[in-house]
Design a protein with these regions (language model features):
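Short amphipathic alpha-helix that is part of the acyltransferase structural core
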Residues: 1-37, 51, 158, 173-210
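A conserved beta-strand-loop-helix scaffold within acyl/acetyltransferase catalytic domains
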Residues: 24-49, 54, 60-71, 75-76, ...
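A structural microfeature
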Residues: 60, 156-159, 234, 306
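Conserved hydrophobic beta-strand within the GNAT/NAT acetyltransferase core sheet
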Residues: 73, 108-111, 249, 283-287
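Conserved acetyl-CoA-binding loop-helix of GNAT-fold acetyltransferases
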Residues: 78, 84-99, 254, 260-277, ...
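Acyl-donor-binding surface of acyltransferase catalytic domains
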Residues: 93-182, 309-313
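Conserved active-site tyrosine of GNAT-family acetyltransferases
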Residues: 147, 297-298, 302
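Short glycine/proline-centered loop/turn elements that form peptide/ligand docking sites
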Residues: 268, 290-293, 314-315
């Protein structure tokens, strides 16, 4: 195999990419030439793309990018008939060397959700429902041992959760949870600026300025809140549905002094119900295997559809 820098081979790269998607080797959504160029060649991400040829036939390509001290490998694909012959390794090592040479400040290469290139992929068994980007390396595929053999090491496992929302009903146990909260003066409802107070103070309490900026500018939208004596002590939302039918999850928080009482689980179930009412057909998200937030998602009925390893290789 001969490797060279990408030179306007978009159509051949797209054909390879889509073949591996259609035959089930990957979960990625098919690309067009336009989407390929937008995702892989955007100059803002300092792209590196290499192609591999056997004679005049393109049999492999790989893509990555770099931001500051971190490089990312986005994709490596090899035609089935040429696998296990070192082609993938050659592409990967060429990418690594190119990123290191052109970015002397780069210290590591990662396969992780921070990659600025997000390749959308289908939820297995639930297409056309999709997710915006893979949070790492799919542990159920040959990609995981492949990158392990190249010296990449896993440091976390990210589970992707999925829940259909078209006919969503809160789990039976949630009625009891809501009743217990109400006995303690806590209600799950929609935010009303005319009767509720303390929303900004919630973000003071949890110390998250990013969420404050995103939420406080959208108080006229539907936001699920937990309130006690009119004070906002927790929230999730705003309720928003994408054109594809995805229920969007923008964050969830509970004041520190009210945690460990099941308020987060009640808020999240209220979010799912509200998104369903607004026409959402599904929701997907990912979180770390050891993140306690997983129990909030599982309590609402979410199930794990794929597990991904975040992987890293120290370069210098």
């Amino acid at each position: 195999m001969t490797i060279s820098t990408y030179r306007n081979e978009a159509e051949s790269c797209v054909s390879l990419f889509n073949l591996l998607t259609q035959n089930g080797d990957t979960l990625f959504k098919p690309l067009t030439v336009s989407s390929f160029e937008r995702l892989f060649l955007d100059p803002a991400i300092c792209p590196a793309v290499f192609v591999g040829y056997e004679g005049d036939r393109l049999i492999a390509f790989g893509a990555g990018n770099c931001t500051g001290e971190t490089g990312y490998i986005t994709y490596i694909g090899v035609l089935p008939g040429y696998r296990r012959s070192g082609c993938g390794r050659m592409i990967a090592e060429t990418l690594e060397a190119a990123l290191a040479d052109t970015h002397p400040e780069m210290k590591k290469i990662e396969l992780v959700f921070y990659n600025p290139t997000e390749l959308p992929w289908f939820i297995p068994g639930h297409a056309p429902h999709d997710h915006a980007g893979e949070p790492g390396v799919d542990m159920s595929t040959p990609a995981y041992p492949f990158f392990s053999s190249l010296g990449y090491r896993a440091w976390t496992v990210q589970n992707t959760y999925y829940l259909p929302l078209a006919d969503y009903r809160c789990p039976d146990e949630m009625a009891g949870r809501l009743a217990r909260l109400k006995e303690n003066g806590i209600e799950i409802t929609r935010y009303d600026r005319n009767i509720h107070h303390g929303f900004s103070e919630l973000f003071d309490n949890i110390g998250n300025e990013g969420w404050r900026k995103r939420v406080m500018s959208r108080l006229d939208e539907d936001i699920v809140v937990a309130v006690r004596n009119g004070q906002v002590i927790g929230y999730t939302g705003p309720l928003s549905v994408s054109k594809e039918g995805r229920g969007l999850f923008c964050g969830i928080a509970v004041r520190t002094e009210y945690r460990h009482h099941g308020i987060g689980k009640a808020l999240f179930a209220g979010l799912c119900a509200g998104l369903s009412e607004k026409g959402a057909s599904f929701m997907s998200l990912f979180t770390g295997d050891n993140n306690p937030a997983r129990y909030v998602y599982e309590s609402a009925g979410f199930t794990i559809v794929r597990s991904f390893a975040t992987m890293r290789k120290i370069i210098r």
